Amino acid sequence: MIGYDIVRVFCGPDGDHGDRIAVVRDGSAVTGEQDRVAFARRSGLTATVFVDDPERGVIDIRSADRRLPFAGAPCLGAAWLLDAPELITPAGVVGVRLDGEFTWLEARPAWAPPRTLRQYDSPEEVDALPVPPPGEWVYAWAWEDEGAGRVRARGFPGRGHGAEEVEATGSAALLLADRLHRALNTSQGRGSQVLTAPARDGLVELGGRVHLDRAVPGASAATRPAITLGSPASSRRRIHLLDL
């Protein structure tokens, strides 16, 4: 069994929720293209990050079916875990900073995968949306408080299989901040929080809370003890790690 960590990215103020990402710190343990795809698929998580050079911050991001040149939550999770000042991705160099309870990165909107940003009249309308049919990746959003830059959002990947809705997504929030040219505080899913703000030279800052619990290599899901996610602010939710 290969060691890996699970992080929750874009946690809410209580330390709960967030997007679950797997991080393999020793990327040399999974080098083959098909092996990485299979590992990411078996994880059952949004994405898996393989750290190919921890000193330089070189990472490789995989979803269940493809390589991702850049993705917000995986980059934030890996940066927080490695305490890295920057990450090197296929899309480019991602600047990183830690600011108290939040981890921030700077990225170019052009790096983000395409998303359909669909505005609705109210948060209640967003909350009442059914899952759209398979097709385009839809980021549904509405103003909670336009003056304060507060947004309510949900993310629908549009896949015919797998996740119908993601708890939190950084790339779509980054694209929305770029479109609106302003800082945003977004509540997504059941209670995740995503922060964005325009930055220098056309970059956009993306920030959120990251919580960690480390997996135990070699134990199966049937025998591995439950683990507790989060920092002292967390709500002590318990999960079982996946058997990879």
Positions of predicted regions on the chain:
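Active-site proximal loop and beta-alpha junction motif in alpha/beta enzyme cores
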Residues: M1-L244
